[in-house]
């Protein structure tokens, strides 16, 4: 069974005539509605009554209650450039409802996340081949989760961020590096727990190298390190589309310390302005995580996977189809035998 996602996005160049840009996107999934009219709250029970486990006539041995799934993702970003500075404002919101089973019944969980960010980047130095920039930013994250109508968590994080970014020409390719430091702050209503005042370091390296006119190699690695026990939202997550292939539905891992390495070879079969660009590709990725103060078997893990796919792009259309296979992984991870990834986008310009 697959999960189909659909959405739309809008890019507006220079809406104020000052070289700025506005971006908005919305994404959702095929929703699975389920009748929950049989459910009751504990407050509505009379003395001696117990909560029902299903609708009238339900048998937990023979019957299966329907799963509920809803997901809505909203994202907004505004950027403005002035000389060597770039100001970025961002806002996003996600609303997710899913279900989990127990031996006798089913429960629905709802999570809501609202994020706001502001970033300022300055180009420190550049020439025809290289560029170095410094960025500072502030993020506010508000996460709520419920099981049925019971509040499970309500957390606000405020995060300060400073990063150093560089790109240069290296052995006929383009090499990029980003060093990043994040710190949880007591500001803007943030939680005052020790976990909310974390420190985290990240390093991203990427390399793009045309080996011939048609053969291209891409390399990307992302590693993060923290001595603190992080909230799940701040851990580095590995597995699935855009990460280690083969673990999108099952087998995602996350950790306070993590590394992910991605390699890809692509070959341009067609490269035409009229017809478009067609490129088959093959990729291999590896990822590993470790969680602080967690000595159990689930405290660390690793995954590796490969994919083979085909990309097609033209002026108004992008298509990507890939077959993904999980390779080696930690013993407790149970991925699917294979996964198929498909995405397409229609571009309309005014």
Where in the sequence are the language-model features?
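C-terminal outer-membrane beta-barrel translocator/porin domains of Gram-negative envelope proteins
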Residues: 144-277, 282-286, 290-292, 332-334, ...
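Transmembrane beta-barrel strands of outer-membrane/channel proteins
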Residues: 8, 22-28, 89-95, 134-142, ...
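Extracellular loop and loop/strand-boundary signature of outer-membrane beta-barrel proteins
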Residues: 29-32, 36-40, 50, 59-64, ...
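Outer-membrane beta-barrel "beta-signal"
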Residues: 310-317, 337-350
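Repeated loop/turn-to-beta-strand initiation elements of outer-membrane beta-barrel proteins
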Residues: 16-22, 83-89, 126-132, 170-175, ...
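Outer-membrane beta-barrel initiation region
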Residues: 1-90, 126
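Hydrophobic, lipid-facing positions within transmembrane beta-strands of outer-membrane proteins
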Residues: 4-10, 72-76, 114-118, 158-164, ...
